[in-house]
Amino acid sequence: MNRRMFKSKIHRATVTHADLHYEGSVTIDADLLEAADILPYEAVDIWNVTRGSRLTTYALAGARGSGVVCINGAAAHLNQPGDLVIIATFADMDDAEARRHTPRVLRVDGRNRPLAEQPPETPGPLAPN
């Protein structure tokens, strides 16, 4: 049996540009792609924390060290500069690999620079009984 697992994410990145007239995709600083284990042309989900929108597109590598997160094409209607987004990837794995898998989570600051400390992801608060 295969399972679809959360593979990696860039957590709370800031959209720097939105280019409605580009063909599509999201351009992301190549350093961030590498740190988050996202390849150019890999499918990514973008969850907009500011607006609540969600979409799927693919990643393109932007200039290293630029901090760029540019939403391209029609998705620019749903994401604007200054919005906070989560950029996530998923991968299909067999059951044994899925049970050993640890996703990569890259937290960034307001300028899309990796935070010095990268604490592990923890579950949210429990609902009261």
Swiss-Prot record:
Annotated catalytic residues: S25, Y58
InterPro entries listed in its UniProt record: Asp_de-COase-like_dom_sf (IPR009010), Asp_decarbox (IPR003190)
Biased composition regions of type Pro residues, renumbered to the chain: 120-129
Cofactor(s) this protein requires: pyruvate
GO cellular component: cytosol
SUPFAM superfamilies from the UniProt entry: ADC-like
Residue numbers carrying Pyruvic acid (Ser): S25
Keywords: Autocatalytic cleavage, Cytoplasm, Decarboxylase, Lyase, Pantothenate biosynthesis, Pyruvate, Schiff base, Zymogen
CC cofactor note: Binds 1 pyruvoyl group covalently per subunit.
Processing and modification events after translation: Is synthesized initially as an inactive proenzyme, which is activated by self-cleavage at a specific serine bond to produce a beta-subunit with a hydroxyl group at its C-terminus and an alpha-subunit with a pyruvoyl group at its N-terminus.
Main localization of the protein described in the UniProt heading: cytoplasm
Residues that coordinate or bind substrate: T57, G73, A74, A75
Compartments, as annotated in UniProt: Cytoplasm
One of the record's GO molecular function terms: aspartate 1-decarboxylase activity
Reaction(s) this enzyme catalyzes, per UniProt: L-aspartate + H(+) = beta-alanine + CO2
Biological-process GO terms, alphabetical: alanine biosynthetic process; pantothenate biosynthetic process
Pathway stated in the Swiss-Prot or TrEMBL entry: Cofactor biosynthesis; (R)-pantothenate biosynthesis; beta-alanine from L-aspartate: step 1/1
Positions of region (Disordered): 99-129
PANTHER family: ASPARTATE 1-DECARBOXYLASE (PTHR21012:SF0)
Function as written in the Swiss-Prot or TrEMBL entry: Catalyzes the pyruvoyl-dependent decarboxylation of aspartate to produce beta-alanine.
Family annotation (NCBIfam families): panD
Family: Belongs to the PanD family.
Quaternary structure and partners: Heterooctamer of four alpha and four beta subunits.
Protein name: Aspartate 1-decarboxylase
Organism of provenance: Sorangium cellulosum (strain So ce56) (Polyangium cellulosum (strain So ce56))
